Amino acid sequence: SQSINYLECHDNRTLYDFLKLNNEENHILDKISLGLAITILTMGTPFIHAGEELLRTKHGFDNSYNLSDDINHIDWYKIPNLTNTLKNLIVIKNKYPHFSYLKKEDINKYLRLEQTSEITSIRYLAKGFPDLQVVISQDYNEYTKYFAPGTKLIFDGNNIVDVTVEKYDFIKPGLYIFKK
């Protein structure tokens, strides 16, 4: 079977508009970044709605198909935006076969899910490649996780990095990738 993974589509409000109701701007960035990461790296076909990475707004209108360009336009120059985060996620998805398993048997064989009340952690295995651990932090509570010696942080929620870590303090929502 196949899946199309998405956070928003042309119907109803944009994710930015929905989150704007109850969140500060920096929290909106963190949450959309987390959502984009899950959408891109989850098995299946990612669908990114036009302007989602640019924090597109339809100014709270649900169905805007019959409204003007003032409502439906994409602000290509909006700062801040998540364009670089999206590019980095696509690089990671293409670099590591861990995120492209197609068969249920492979998913069952090569993925290990660990969940606590603070974070979700998924260990990805791939023959001939280093093990990856994806950690999903879902809130702003601080949580420290310890790692085996030699572990490297390769994605910090927004950027591709290469930092050796023995422990990491998660302080905001995000998807983080570690390599052993």
Where are these regions (language model features)?
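Alpha-amylase-like alpha-glycosidases and glucanotransferases acting on alpha-linked glucans and related
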Residues: 1-26
